Amino acid sequence: MPRATKMRVVTVDENGKELGDAKWVDIPEPDHFASDGFAQIESYVSRLLGSSARFTSIIIATPDQQMAVSLWQRAGVPEFTLSVEWRSEAERERAVRQFFSERGLSTSHDYLAGNGGVPDATRCLGYFLPPDVQFITALTKDVLRQIYHLREQDALDFSFKEHHDAV
């Protein structure tokens, strides 16, 4: 599967309703780590929390793009976001909800979005996080291990972006 080079970005409210106009943005080539991807997470989380941009994001993905999670910070509030194909990944959705509930983290968003021409194919979930590098690093590693069954030594791609003009 070829790597996507553009992404349509739109701001949505907590119910998934679009706010404002969407725009197409370039997706930069990710930083690729062929092994020990987990060892890179803390430095990216530090960059995220240290950013003064209005909106900053990190996408952490496997090189084959079969798994991806995102960390965001908007107006100083960090979030962990992910999506699941809820019809075919019901067990994963349940595991994600349980994982964050057990840690007392509240939902920032939970809505269905379109994918592949199916209007409600993808469940988009987000959770508010405390602005703590160690906590977010450990949580991210736990999600990758427990939900996605990745290992410390696995390859990971990181896309870091500061959006100074974000709303």
Place the predicted regions along the sequence by residue.
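Structured alpha/beta or helical-core interaction and ligand-binding surfaces enriched in interleaved
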Residues: P2-V167
